[in-house]
Amino acid sequence: MKFYPEGKNPDLLKTFDSVDELKMAMINNEVIESKALLCDREHNLHVDLGAVRGIIPRLEGAIGIDDGSVRDIALISKVNKRICFNVLGFEKDIYDNSIAILSRKAVQLRCMEEYLNRLVPGDVIDASVTHLEKFGAFIDIGAGVNALIPIDMLSVSRISHPKERLSEGQSIKVVLRKKEPSKMTFSLKELLGTWEDNAKNFTPGETVTGVVRSIEDYGVFVELAPNLAGLAEPQNNLFVGQQVAVYVKSVIPEKMKIKLVIVEAFSDADVPKELTYYIEDRHIDYFRYSPQNSSKQIFTDFNE
């Protein structure tokens, strides 16, 4: 079975016309998705399955809830979002109505065993952004299992917060950077192109749009693409995140430098743009960002 981030496989979203249909799904160990309607006082999640109501008991809500390594906010935050689960069995409520007892943790354990545990550094997978913190982006790498992209692995161009690069709910591709017994760390920047891949889109004499990323005494760093920035001369009344129009003065591959002139600054701040991926392979062993003739070599070796 192929595992997806929650909410990204429409084939799993189902309702059932009868309890018998749901029992068949249980027998077949079928993975189902439905929107979480409620997280009750005991932090059980409730879903509507059509024929019956379904409940995911707190301890079945996610890997790590039982040992405290995952906090209950991981359950509370799923309200009004699609979640995956298996059917464990059935009980009766006080009104003698059938209730389906479900497990999200069971699907996550299966995802770990059949998919995530088999990944090796350099593997490229699909993910979904779940939430953003100052230090990085949390992503769903399959069945609601979360992992982190540290902020410095989101792009070569430096940003002050992941919201400048990504948005919650966004589908992205990521590459496994480091695998440890208790966690996996992912990266995005190796998929967004080398210096040359990005620089070839800009020609001296052109005027293009960019985003102010850093203001220093000696100049202003302007992002032209997530993996490419140029330097403009100092200018007053700019702010980090501001959109600007810049004139491309020169492109110098051996120094990995692009000289810019700020033509106009706009009052609005930048919003994340759709990402362009330069790598289509599902696995990479080595990524060299810098040109071969550059005096400074920047690379990632996924076999280290």
Where are these regions (language model features)?
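Short N-terminal signal/transit or membrane-insertion segments
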Residues: T15-A25, E60-V70, R104, Q108-C111, ...
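A cross-kingdom feature marking solvent-exposed beta-strand/loop segments within repeated
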Residues: R53-S77, L109-Y115, L119-V120, N146-E168, ...
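A short acidic, glycine/proline-enriched capping/turn motif at secondary-structure boundaries
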Residues: G54, A62-I63, I83, G89-Y95, ...
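Short acidic, gly/pro-rich beta-turn/loop elements at beta-sheet edges
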Residues: P57, Y95, M112, A137, ...
